[in-house]
């Protein structure tokens, strides 16, 4: 049950010049499901990417990392669902390379110009033969179809677009898709995200921008505290809008383009939380007046990933001592609890180390019954702030994950 999230139509997701999309049914996920996607990238495009921090990262992550900075440039991304190709050892890498070679033959490039991505069950061999057999059968697709093809336990395809001025003369377009519903936690999580723009950006600058955007968007979400083996976020810049290249972060267009792409990426990241496994509520946790952003994030994550907090939200139960407890164990050094203020939406709940005199249980109940809730925490020890996004923890989460392989 997604929280205020609906599927985008093809008309809402404009094509990006220099990008071609293809999908097919490879039979990796389940019979009758479209589970293979190819994103063909025009020659001369640049690509930035960031990947999971999980030490058991999947075979395609290893291969994509090694191909990303190849001097020949990236010409294609190939994505399968239904199998993560993680925990598959040397054979997993052989299989990922075989898929790259087959995709390269299909579009006429070198295997090292293909980035592979997989998502699905871990510790199962990749049926590379099925993927290779399906590649010649791929059909042209729209962005909304590609968004559906990369889903696993998602209930709604996730896609978004932006258009805006970058520089004085040029309008930039960007469209992106993402997947993810469970095993979601900062530092990328099983989440895949792909954004394409017609802006022209040098590879080193695009790589830095990709890292910054990931940190400000996908690394601010948590569903269940688990970090996947396959997380990947990619930005493709085709350079087809005739603007001159952005090759320096001091270029004013860098900040303009980053703001546009950050807005798109944040919509995709929030969509993952809204479609969190079993989610019935979307929760924003904002910590203000911290000494540093890291400290603010530390406190926000403690609240956002607490099972006790998340189940209280599911039950619409204003058992708000759970939130105070999470702030207390967040590890904020020398925290003066007498200075902390906590709000549910605009309702002051706690101050001076205890319950606010003005707060009533009825007020808390009214807020906790909403589908979207904001928790605001003021530490009163500095000027830094951070926001993270999470969802509640329901019976549905347990059922989805208990039945995942059945």
Swiss-Prot record:
Q: Where in the cell is it found?
A: Cytoplasm
Q: Which top class of enzyme applies to this chain?
A: transferase
Record: residues binding substrate? 152, 179, 190, 277, 401, 406
Recorded E.C. number(s)? 2.3.1.35, 2.3.1.1
One term under GO cellular component: cytoplasm
Pathway it belongs to? Amino-acid biosynthesis; L-arginine biosynthesis; L-ornithine and N-acetyl-L-glutamate from L-glutamate and N(2)-acetyl-L-ornithine (cyclic): step 1/1; Amino-acid biosynthesis; L-arginine biosynthesis; N(2)-acetyl-L-ornithine from L-glutamate: step 1/4
Q: Sorted alphabetically, which InterPro entries does this protein's record hold?
A: Arg_biosynth_ArgJ (IPR002813), ArgJ-like_dom_sf (IPR016117), ArgJ_beta_C (IPR042195)
Coiled coil regions, renumbered to chain: none
Report keywords, A-Z.
Acyltransferase, Amino-acid biosynthesis, Arginine biosynthesis, Autocatalytic cleavage, Cytoplasm, Multifunctional enzyme, Transferase
Question: Per the record, what are the reactions this protein catalyses?
Answer: N(2)-acetyl-L-ornithine + L-glutamate = N-acetyl-L-glutamate + L-ornithine; L-glutamate + acetyl-CoA = N-acetyl-L-glutamate + CoA + H(+)
> Where does the entry annotate site (Cleavage)?
189-190
Question: Which residues are listed under the site Involved in the stabilization of negative charge on the oxyanion by the formation of the oxyanion hole?
Answer: 119-120
Q: Which GO terms describe its biological process?
A: L-arginine biosynthetic process; ornithine biosynthetic process
UniProt keyword annotation of Protein transport present: no
Domain of life from the UniProt record: Bacteria
Sequence similarity: Belongs to the ArgJ family.
Indicate the quaternary assembly: Heterotetramer of two alpha and two beta chains.
What this protein is reported to do is described as: Catalyzes two activities which are involved in the cyclic version of arginine biosynthesis: the synthesis of N-acetylglutamate from glutamate and acetyl-CoA as the acetyl donor, and of ornithine by transacetylation between N(2)-acetylornithine and glutamate.
Query: Know the name of this protein?
Result: Arginine biosynthesis bifunctional protein ArgJ
Give the gene name.
argJ
